[in-house]
């Protein structure tokens, strides 16, 4: 069995502004909110031990907005169980007032043109996030 991602921690400029969005997204897709971190951040966990955390930025560049075209994380994507679930999360994001970068649509340039259906949105720091459904390979 190949290695899988165990956890990801994201640096966030304003935890109070970002936490509600991450809570909406992560609980929608099955994560459970864990305990807060001592630094003010927190994490969400899956039953298999995978987790995603947010931590406050520190240091000289703490106020800098995320730039996905600089060194570091370009975007983060989660797998959806269905197209309907992509649409459901999109509706929740719109009601929340999240920044939608690209609404749910087919993106034939990805996945060899085989049914890649996704919504793209941003967190308050401008980090690009994605929720994507791809049909099982046949």
Spans of features found by a protein language model:
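N-terminal beta-strand motif that seeds the catalytic metal site of vicinal oxygen chelate
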Residues: 1-19, 76, 135-138
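Short glycine-enriched loop/turn motifs at secondary-structure junctions
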Residues: 2-4, 69-73, 113
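Core segments of cupin and vicinal oxygen chelate
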Residues: 9-58
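Vicinal oxygen chelate
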Residues: 12-17, 76-117, 122-124
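Long, continuous compositionally biased terminal/linker segments
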Residues: 45-88
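Short beta->alpha transition motifs characteristic of CBS
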Residues: 113-114, 120, 131-138
